[in-house]
Amino acid sequence: MSLVAVPVAYMPLVDAAPLIIAQEMGFAKAEGIALELIAAPSWSSVRDMLAFGRVDAAHMLSPLPVAMAMGLGGVATTLSAVSVLSVNGNVIGVGKPLEEALRKTGFDFDFKDPFRAAKALQKVRSGPLIFGVPFPFSMHVELLRYWSQATAIGVDGIEIRTVPPPLMASALEAGDVDAFCVGEPWGSVAVEQGKGALLLPGAAIWNFAPEKVLAVRKDWAETEPNLLGRLMRAVWRAGRWLSDPDVRATTSDLLSRKAYLDVSAELIDRALSGHLMVSERGEQRKVDQFLEFHFGAASFPWTSQSKWIAQQLQQFHSDGGSCKIDAATKVFRADLHRRHLNFAEADLPNASDKIEGAIRHVTPVASSGGLLSLLPNQFFDAHIFDKSEK
């Protein structure tokens, strides 16, 4: 059978797994497509490859297409986020000087309490903390700002500096940044190289944050609906496959290949299992749902998530007006997700938005298959975000 090539850009991160697995484990082939996976050196490269037609789809930071719809970042192409590729998966960490200063105060790197971590940082900092992040329009930045704004650090207590994920450990060593927020495995790489320690999982700030999305150009989605559906189904089935704990070893081995992440399988397994080593001392911490690809409708692009992102962006970018917020909330395409995954045994929620922060326990919801439950989506400060509120 002749396969249709679909070029896809991605960054070398554990949360690119649904794309890699879709190709490597035959889910793409079953849909009659072959994913041409193109590793990019930076998120701006991923954006540009998609925006200017070098690729048809991309592994993308969830706030990036929203920011583009708001006229931020200088690239005007309209993108659609047709699926969420991953939920959570980031780590917040500090370089060696901050780690040593924190330990002198008795801080034990519990890896779970955002208020305690912020209070400890406030005690030892002498000025704004420079955080390395992968891109200005990223969940990393939004989580850092949300955390700092609600704690002792304060929104003026951090400065943001862009560092490509694979270079985060080098930036710490050079003293270019004091701390970081990055996707795995690059936080664990910094720990393994003795360049820093992990302070918090991103999930400690918002415990069901949409991290990466499957993004396509809006016009491509309209002109290639059949191809889009085949791509979405292959990736969704890969995410479902990844939800089985028994496939972790296979996944780690595949992702560790030089063609993909080119780091040890053991480091990749830390993210997949949620068993993270937070310092070179060997201190280990377990985080439930550290990185989620499937359960709890993880892949569903909720319009409430896109509105939360848009409002966060508007708060820090004065050129993102209310009219642009309306356009931005249409970037997460629940309609396309529902249309194309009706053919993939997916149990999809009947609603397209939810109240972010309100789900405290596993909660059954009305769905196409009648068996769907959503996972907790709390913010650490107990804030509730209702999309219907202006």
Describe each PLM feature range.
Residues 55-56, 164-198, 217, 258, ...:
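Ligand-binding pocket segment of bilobal, Venus flytrap-like solute-binding proteins
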Residues 4-153, 178-188, 195-208:
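Short, glycine-/small- and polar/acidic-enriched structural segments
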Residues 227-333:
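Secondary-structure end/capping motifs
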Residues 41-43, 163-166:
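Short acidic loop-to-helix transition motifs that present clustered carboxylates
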Residues 307-390:
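Conserved C-terminal helix/tail region of periplasmic/extracytoplasmic solute-binding proteins
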Residues 36-38, 159-163:
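General small-molecule cofactor/ligand-binding pocket signal
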Residues 27-29, 96-112, 211-265:
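Extended ligand-binding regions for polar small-molecule ligands
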